[in-house]
Structures are given as C-alpha cells and as structure tokens.
C-alpha cells in the first residue's frame, strides 16, 4: 500500500525523524491559511499524488501553468495562486503514465537552505534476506538513472535483522555520502530512526529523495515515499487510515475486494490463471507468441465460482482487452468450478472477444464438458503453448 508524502512525513515524525513544518490543503484558501502559519518567506507547494517525478512532471491543462508539480514560491499570495492552478488539474510524470493523475490535495511546506542533495532508501533485499540501506550522493535524480549510468555512485549496506542497526552501519553510510563532523552524528540518529520506523510498520520500501544537508549542517528528508506490505496491514490500523482509494487503479481496487491478485498492464490479452508462477509463465509465452498481456491475475487455489466470475468481469472491464486466455492447472482448484465461473461471467457481461481456455488437473473432463454444453464460442487448448498461439491468432483475426 502506498501513501502520500505528507502522510509519510507524519509517520516519520512519530519516530523522531526531523521534518520541515507543513500542512495539507484541499483548496487554495486552505493552502494560503497553512502558509500563514509557516515561518516563510520561502514556501514549497507540492502536488500530492501516488507517483514519483512530480517536480519534473507537467500538467495537461494550460490553466495549470507550465511549471511542474512541485513549486518554490516566495509569498502567501503565490502559494494561493499556484495551489489554485494545481488543484483539480492532471499531473503527468514518468511514473503516472500518459493519462496522469488528478491533483486533489497539495502539501505546503517551509522552504530551506539546501547545501547538498543526497539519496537514501531502505528496502528488503531478497538476495541477502536483509533490510538494506541504499545511498547515493546523486540526490534529486531518479535512482534508476543513476544505477544505469553511474552504478559506482550507489552504496549498499545490509543490516542483519537478528542484530538490528548499529552505529557502524550508520557511519559506513554517512562516510559513503561524504558527511563529516556533526553531520555524521545527526545522520546516525536519522538512519537509526528510519530503520526502526521501517521494521515496526512493516514497510516494504522507504525512499528519501532528496535527503538534504542544510546550510547550518542539519540533515533533513525533503521528500519521502513509503510503501507498506499489504499482507501486514491488519497489524497497523493507523496506517490503513492513510489509504487513498482515489489514487488506486479502479480494477485493482475491485480485485482486492475479492481477494484477487490483479495488476493492470498495457497489453490486449487478458489473463486469468491460478498461481503466481503459472501466471508469469503465461504472460511470458503470450509475449513469445507475439501478443501482449493486459494484466496479471492470480485467482488463487481456493477460488469459488463467485470469485472466478468477479475475476472475469474485472478483466472484461478493461477496454484494451481484445481477447482472454484462461489457464488453469487444477490441484486445489477444481476445473469444473473454473468452467462454471467463466460461463456465468461470459453470459452476464455478453462476451464479445475471443476466449481461449486451457484446463488441466482435477475434474478436467467435467470442466471441458460444462464448457462444450454451454454453447458459448469458447476455444479449447491442449497445452500452454497451444493456448497462447490460439489466443494471439484469434485476437489478430478479430481486429
């Protein structure tokens, strides 16, 4: 689960992380009121959307001006005018997709005297099975760009969860960033607090970009992004309250209500599969045969007819879907249940795209019989390669 920048800073503040004073606003009037409570005379107006690259982004609407989604201003009047331009406008960034995201709230924050910009993040490294600190002197840039062009500028520090973070971990990272004197002590306190926050909130990624060193030597997170493990949210009702469903994909949101693992992609062939590994293999072979998957969808091993029907409806709600491939290996999941769910959904939504079904496993013959007797134009496949070839061919012929 993702949260907004201002919410992330609220979480960090609870752990003693120094953050600049600021407040969220939903109208230009509220934005000006927040600014009046800040020290000034420099303020930063920040669009709040679940996408990175806001500062380098652009708005679709000419009325929003030609500046990005993060603007430095020098008066409360400018706070008002810029907030008015941004609120309700559509911000497009390299992470939002071409459709962009509507700005429904802005964060007004005190400006600061920036001497250096650094990069810092904590994440779970599956290669080392440890929480790992990633740091770079190239703050303010996309870390992917740094990794591609200057990988030597990224420093990694793994932390064994059995022992937790220690002073030497913090000093290693501080020295890699070129910090010195009192800055090292300030950074040690900061990183220790970030690690505690990361582990106690079941965070999956905590990114600060940039982490700035101010003119008076303070080390402060200027921007912050936090993602949380959705499987652990039941332990954090306070974090769940930060969820902004308006920022989530409508289809992914609907899928979550039915305990379906769904991720929207850019292709035209919808996929419904049981098991994450088989789902990824299915997407791979669709690409291999010349198609492009429209989604990742794992219905799980214990799906009911109703759940399968819901999955089918979600796939068909994507206007980009020109064909569907159902690939089921029935172990715990029975093939007859899948067949009944697919047929029920196809009839309910008036299926008008090619449908290829590959069934194997428990009750497979019964499942195939149910589909044949349904009278629906379902294309049966014998194996995964055959299924991928048939759905790609059917989509091309139908277009």
Curated annotation (Swiss-Prot):
GO terms for molecular function: ATP binding; magnesium ion binding; succinate-CoA ligase (ADP-forming) activity; succinate-CoA ligase (GDP-forming) activity. ATP binds at residues 46, 53-55, 109, 112, 117. Its EC number is 6.2.1.5. Keywords: ATP-binding, Ligase, Magnesium, Metal-binding, Nucleotide-binding, Tricarboxylic acid cycle. Its cofactor is Mg(2+). Substrate binds at residues 274, 331-333. Binds 1 Mg(2+) ion per subunit. Mg(2+) binds at residues 209, 223. Residues 9-254 form the ATP-grasp domain. GO terms for biological process: succinyl-CoA metabolic process; tricarboxylic acid cycle. It catalyses: succinate + ATP + CoA = succinyl-CoA + ADP + phosphate; GTP + succinate + CoA = succinyl-CoA + GDP + phosphate. Heterotetramer of two alpha and two beta subunits. Succinyl-CoA synthetase functions in the citric acid cycle (TCA), coupling the hydrolysis of succinyl-CoA to the synthesis of either ATP or GTP and thus represents the only step of substrate-level phosphorylation in the TCA. The beta subunit provides nucleotide specificity of the enzyme and binds the substrate succinate, while the binding sites for coenzyme A and phosphate are found in the alpha subunit. This is Succinate--CoA ligase [ADP-forming] subunit beta. The lineage of its organism: Bacteria, Pseudomonadati, Pseudomonadota, Alphaproteobacteria, Rhodospirillales.
């Amino acid at each position: 689960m993702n949260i907004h920048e201002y919410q992330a800073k609220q979480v960090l503040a609870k752990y003693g992380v120094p953050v600049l004073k600021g407040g969220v606003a939903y109208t230009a009037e509220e934005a000006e009121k927040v600014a009046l409570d800040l020290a000034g005379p420099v303020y930063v107006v920040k669009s709040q959307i679940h996408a990175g690259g806001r500062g380098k982004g652009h708005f679709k609407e000419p009325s929003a001006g030609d500046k990005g989604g993060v603007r430095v201003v020098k008066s409360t009047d400018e706070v008002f005018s810029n907030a008015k331009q941004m609120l309700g406008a559509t911000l497009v960034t390299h992470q939002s997709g071409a459709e962009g995201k509507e700005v429904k709230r802005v964060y007004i924050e005190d400006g600061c005297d920036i001497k250096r910009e650094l990069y810092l993040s904590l994440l779970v490294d599956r290669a080392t099975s440890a929480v790992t600190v990633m740091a770079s002197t190239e703050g303010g840039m996309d870390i992917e760009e740094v990794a591609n062009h200057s990988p030597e500028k990224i420093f990694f520090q793994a932390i064994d969860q059995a022992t937790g973070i220690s002073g030497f971990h913090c000093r290693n990272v501080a020295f890699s960033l070129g910090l010195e004197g009192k800055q090292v002590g300030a950074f040690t306190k900061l990183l220790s607090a970030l690690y505690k926050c990361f582990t106690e909130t079941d965070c999956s990624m905590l990114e600060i970009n940039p982490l700035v060193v101010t003119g008076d030597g303070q080390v402060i997170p200027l921007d912050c992004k936090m993602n949380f493990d959705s499987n652990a949210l039941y332990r954090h009702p306070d974090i769940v309250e930060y969820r902004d469903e308006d920022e989530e994909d409508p289809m992914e949101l609907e899928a979550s209500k039915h305990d379906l693992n769904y991720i929207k992609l850019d292709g035209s062939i919808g996929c419904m599969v049981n098991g994450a590994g088989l789902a990824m293999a299915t997407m791979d072979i669709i690409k291999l045969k010349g198609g492009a998957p429209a989604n990742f969808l794992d219905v799980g091993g214990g799906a009911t007819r109703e759940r399968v029907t819901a999955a089918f409806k979600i796939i068909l709600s994507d206007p980009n879907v020109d064909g569907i491939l159902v690939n089921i290996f029935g172990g715990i999941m029975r093939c007859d249940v899948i067949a009944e769910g697919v047929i029920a959904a196809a009839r309910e939504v008036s299926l008008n795209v090619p449908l290829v079904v590959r069934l194997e496993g428990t009750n497979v013959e019964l499942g195939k019989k149910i589909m044949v007797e349904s009278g629906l134009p379902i294309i049966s496949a014998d194996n995964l390669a055959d299924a991928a070839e048939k759905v790609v061919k059917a989509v091309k012929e139908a277009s």
